[in-house]
């Protein structure tokens, strides 16, 4: 009959070995970062604040499909889609994201929403300073998330590029706003033709 191995207790050596790691760390140079005075640059593919992208002519890429909201494990994204009209067009397709909100009190910056987006409308920037003392300020709206306008862009809503359709936008055939493109009146947002800076 084989002898059973004797069970050995934790003994005295295990706690000493654990404290040995702590004791060694006491004499190492501390790596203190002087933040925010000295900020390190983030990696190019850093997962920071989200951004809603635009087409080269200024129309929005978001089509209000809500796939990003379904993919979010923290339930931090709220999207409400609406239909485009010829009088008020925000994206080249049939629909656009009328309401878009991201709650950064819940968001874990995992990037699953980016992978789910079929139009590459949603990407992540390198901005990471999102802390705020108010929970309400941590809910970013579409206006806060929407990318800025470049020189060859016209703010939405406006008509699509003449002679182009939705597929041409996604093929990259539209590279700038058509000459003479003017911003349409956003009636859904309460604008009127006589509002300053808005033309009928």
Swiss-Prot record:
Residues 52-82, 98-127 form the 4Fe-4S ferredoxin-type domain. Binds 2 [4Fe-4S] clusters per subunit. GO terms for molecular function: 4 iron, 4 sulfur cluster binding; iron ion binding; NADH:ubiquinone reductase (non-electrogenic) activity; quinone binding. Residues 181-200 are annotated as: Disordered. Keywords: 4Fe-4S, Cell membrane, Iron, Iron-sulfur, Membrane, Metal-binding, NAD, Quinone, Repeat, Translocase. [4Fe-4S] cluster 2 binds at residues 72, 107, 110, 113. Pfam families: Fer4_7. One of its GO terms (cellular component) is plasma membrane. It catalyses: a quinone + NADH + 5 H(+)(in) = a quinol + NAD(+) + 4 H(+)(out). Residues 189-200 have a biased composition (Basic and acidic residues). It is a peripheral membrane protein. It is found in: Cell membrane. Its EC number is 7.1.1.-. GO terms for biological process: aerobic respiration. Its main location: membrane. [4Fe-4S] cluster 1 binds at residues 62, 65, 68, 117. The keyword Cell membrane applies. Gene3D superfamilies: 3.30.70.3270. It comes from the Bacteria. Its cofactor is [4Fe-4S] cluster. NDH-1 is composed of 14 different subunits. Subunits NuoA, H, J, K, L, M, N constitute the membrane sector of the complex. Belongs to the complex I 23 kDa subunit family. NDH-1 shuttles electrons from NADH, via FMN and iron-sulfur (Fe-S) centers, to quinones in the respiratory chain. The immediate electron acceptor for the enzyme in this species is believed to be ubiquinone. Couples the redox reaction to proton translocation (for every two electrons transferred, four hydrogen ions are translocated across the cytoplasmic membrane), and thus conserves the redox energy in a proton gradient. This is NADH-quinone oxidoreductase subunit I 1. It comes from Streptomyces avermitilis (strain ATCC 31267 / DSM 46492 / JCM 5070 / NBRC 14893 / NCIMB 12804 / NRRL 8165 / MA-4680). The gene is nuoI1.
């Amino acid at each position: 009959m084989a002898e059973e191995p004797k069970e050995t207790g934790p003994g005295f050596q295990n706690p000493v070995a654990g404290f040995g790691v702590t004791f060694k760390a006491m004499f190492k140079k501390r790596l203190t970062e002087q933040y925010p005075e000295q900020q390190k640059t983030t990696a190019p593919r850093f997962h920071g604040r989200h951004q809603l992208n635009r087409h080269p002519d200024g129309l929005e890429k978001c089509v209000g499909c809500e796939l990003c909201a379904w993919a979010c494990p923290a339930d931090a994204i709220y999207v409400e889609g609406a239909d485009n009209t010829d009088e008020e067009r925000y994206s080249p397709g049939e629909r656009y994201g009328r309401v878009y909100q991201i709650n950064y009190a819940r968001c874990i910056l995992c990037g699953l929403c980016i992978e789910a987006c079929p139009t590459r409308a949603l990407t992540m920037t390198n901005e990471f300073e999102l802390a705020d003392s108010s929970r309400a300020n941590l809910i970013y709206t579409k206006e806060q998330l929407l990318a800025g306008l470049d020189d060859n862009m016209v703010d939405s809503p406006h008509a699509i590029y003449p002679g182009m359709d939705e597929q041409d936008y996604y093929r990259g055939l539209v590279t700038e706003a058509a000459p003479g493109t003017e911003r349409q009146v956003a009636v859904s947002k309460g604008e009127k033709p006589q509002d300053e800076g808005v033309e009928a």
